[in-house]
A protein has these predicted regions:
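Secretory pathway targeting signatures of secreted, lumenal, and periplasmic proteins
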Residues: 1-82, 88-90, 94
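Short, well-structured beta-strand
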Residues: 78-171
Length: 171
C-alpha cells in the first residue's frame, strides 16, 4: 500500500498471476513505479550488461513505513530498516575501453530500499528499476524517475512522501 496526492494519477496498472505493476504519473511526466516480480527464483533476476558498469550513490533521505515481516512462512525481518534513498549516477565505465569509472553528474531517482543498501554501488544491473529491487518473496521495487533526470523541489517533496508511505497491508 502507498498514499499519493490527487495531482498524481495511475497511468498503468497490470496484474498477472505472478507480477504486478502500478505507475503513477504527474503532469510533468515524472513517474513512480511499483513492481512486484514473482515466479523468478531469488538471485535470478537478470538484466545486466556484459560491457557497461555504472557507479551509483545511494543516500537515505527519509524513513520508510515499510516494515518487513512474514511472507509465506518466511521471516524477512532480517532485511532491517527501510528508507527512501536518493540514487544518483556518479560514474560510468565501458569495460572494453576504460580502466576506471568516468565521473558523471547523472540522473537522480529515488527508491525504497533496505537501509544497509545505502552507500556506493558499482553495478551492471540497469535499468535502475531492476537494480533498485529487494527480495520479499519475489522481487519488489518502488522507484521514482523524472523525465529529464532531475526533480523539481515540489516533486521531490511529493515523491519522498509517496515512497515513504509504502507499507505492508495490515490484515
Amino acid at each position: 500500500l502507498f498514499d499519493y496526492p490527487e495531482n498524481w494519477t495511475i497511468t498503468k496498472e497490470e496484474v498477472s498471476q505472478t507480477d504486478e505493476t502500478v505507475v503513477l504519473t504527474n503532469e510533468r511526466g515524472s513517474t513512480i513505479t511499483y513492481t512486484y516480480i514473482g515466479g523468478v527464483a531469488e538471485g535470478q533476476l537478470g538484466s545486466g550488461s556484459a560491457t557497461d558498469m555504472t557507479r551509483i550513490e545511494l543516500s537515505a533521505v527519509a524513513d520508510s513505513q515499510f516494515i518487513p515481516g512474514y511472507v509465506d512462512a518466511r521471516n524477512y525481518e532480517d532485511l532491517g530498516k527501510f528508507v527512501v534513498a536518493e540514487t544518483k549516477i556518479t560514474g560510468t565505465m565501458d569495460m572494453l575501453t576504460d580502466s576506471d569509472f568516468v565521473d558523471t553528474d547523472g540522473a537522480v531517482s529515488f527508491a525504497v530500499l533496505p537501509e544497509n543498501r545505502t552507500g556506493t554501488e558499482e553495478t551492471t544491473d540497469l535499468p535502475l528499476r531492476v537494480q533498485n529491487t529487494f527480495w520479499y518473496s519475489g522481487y519488489v521495487s518502488f522507484t521514482a524517475q523524472a523525465p529529464d533526470g532531475q526533480f523539481t523541489e515540489a516533486e521531490q517533496t511529493e515523491v519522498i512522501a509517496i515512497l515513504s508511505s509504502f507499507r505492508v497491508e495490515d490484515n
